[in-house]
Amino acid sequence: MKFGTLFIALLLAGSTAQAQIPTPTSEAGPWSLDDCIRYAHEHNIQIQQQALQVEQRSVELNTSRHSRLPDLGANLGTNFSFGRSLISNNTYADNNQVSGSLGVSASLPVFMGGRINHEIAAGKLSLKAAAQDLDRIREDVSVNIMSYYLDVLVAKELVDVAEQALALSTQQVERSREQVRTGKVAESVLYENEALLAADEYKLTQSRNDLSLSLLALSQALNRTSAEGFDIVAPTFDSLTVESMRHLRNPAEVLSYALDNRPRIQAERFRLEQALRAVRMSRAAYYPQITLTGGYGTNVYHSFATGAVNPAFGRQFRNNSTEYVGVAINIPIFNRMATRNSVRTAKLGVRSQQLVLTEAEQTLQKEIETAYYQADAALLKYRSAEKALNSAQVAFRYEAEKYAAGRSTTFDYNLSLIHISEPTRRSYI
């Protein structure tokens, strides 16, 4: 749900995710989002497995298409016989002999009740569904990488916030030391500021640890061999990035587009059409099947009996040959309700696939609606944090001036500093 929601949120903002052909990515230097997605598409095991499934469906379709072609086979045989046997004068005599046979046969399906046509159509639909599944997995992997990439960006920004807070705390401690030395403030003020400095150092350490873990998670999601030296580059944002969120597309409009374009929905629709074809394939067993057959055969022999006359092999090959052509018609009459139950089973498969498609469409609608309201709430939250940050920055400047002039307490100064840090953190989370 997290990945689907993130993708729909991007879709609501007018972004589209397109599957790209993977290309090798350099290990050196910071990685961009495109680098990460391309690398993931190339090294993700699920994508590779599904690509094999697509290839397998293509092979199966090729098999179905070639089922229209005739079967052609040949046979060769040789027999050796030894001992006494009945001869032409109705007596037994020693008659060792060798005989051989050669045959070629073929059969051609003429009418199979339309089963072959339906098998080919079902194979095409199966191939299309597998290709859509491949696009869906690529899409899921892309959104997964986007999510981890965003986590790293947030962690980087929080490190920057913690570093800025630490820099201010360090300046405050140095200022307090000078004020204690000149007798302007009590020594307890210095201790308070040093405690605040220690807290900010802890926050910075924690933020850096979180960043390291985020980079590790992204590296593992990419299936890299090691996370050592791995880093990313932040994308360039401008005012249009946030401005685009101010004009979110209506959920109904997004749903209409997604129902016609999301790979998951398209795959289930292809499977529904495939299930309908399965019903027609089952019904084909009600019709007669017509097969055309033909063949050629011949045989030769040689007797080792005394006085035996053995014609030349070439003459035997010609004179003993036989050819045949036939038509076989298989008419189904009663097969213990097997065909009827096969059709009923196929119809149940159609109903089951209709439910799967309906569930997928309902899930998509929920994801779109959830993403829409989450994006809208995030925009409102961002605006509130932006206003709070601007107000806190103005208040901090005045508080810093008052503190420098000795007209404010350390507590008020530190509180004003906290008021800057919190809106800044909320704007990234």
Walk through the language-model features, giving the residues of each.
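Bacterial Sec-dependent N-terminal signal peptides
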Residues: 1-27
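Bacterial Sec-pathway N-terminal export signals of envelope proteins
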Residues: 19-73, 77, 83, 226, ...
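Small/polar-residue-enriched beta-strand and adjacent coil segments characteristic
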Residues: 30, 71-85, 90-136, 266-278, ...
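Amphipathic alpha-helical coiled-coil segments
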Residues: 49-64, 137, 141-160, 178, ...
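Transmembrane beta-barrel architecture of outer-membrane proteins
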Residues: 99-101, 147, 192, 322-324, ...
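Periplasmic alpha-helical coiled-coil/stalk elements that build and connect Gram-negative outer-membrane
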Residues: 140-257, 374, 378
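Single conserved hydrophobic/aromatic residue that forms the stacking wall/gate
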Residues: 419-422, 426-429
